[in-house]
Amino acid sequence: MPEGRSITAAELALLDPDGTFSSRLAADRDVLTGLARDLWTAPAESRQRRLAEMEGLAHRLGGAAGTFGYLTVSDAAFELEARIAVRRGEGESPFAEIEDRLAALLGTLEEALRER
């Protein structure tokens, strides 16, 4: 599939014949929401562990969503992953950018789930 082109319904049917990928999107949304709950008030060790889990999930979701034609979800997931990685290198920097990227990803997941 050329970069930037969404897959067609026929291509999606070949990739996801039983249509269960949207269930994964919903499950990933729920996990991200749980990881984010009270994240910034959690003890530092717990916060770091949860951010690492969120980063890994964002990476996996970014790749899978792109494969299944959810390009906006893929882009938002990779943006969240990148922001978490940058923050790790900066130490205890402001969290607003991570919160913004997470909100954007959750929004694209909601939109994708409504459309499918």
What are these regions (language model features)?
Residues 11, 40, 56:
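Residue-level detector of functional hotspots within protein domains
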Residues 48-86:
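Extended, amphipathic alpha-helices with heptad-repeat/coiled-coil or helix-bundle character
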Residues 1-36, 87-116:
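Amphipathic, coiled-coil-like alpha-helical segments
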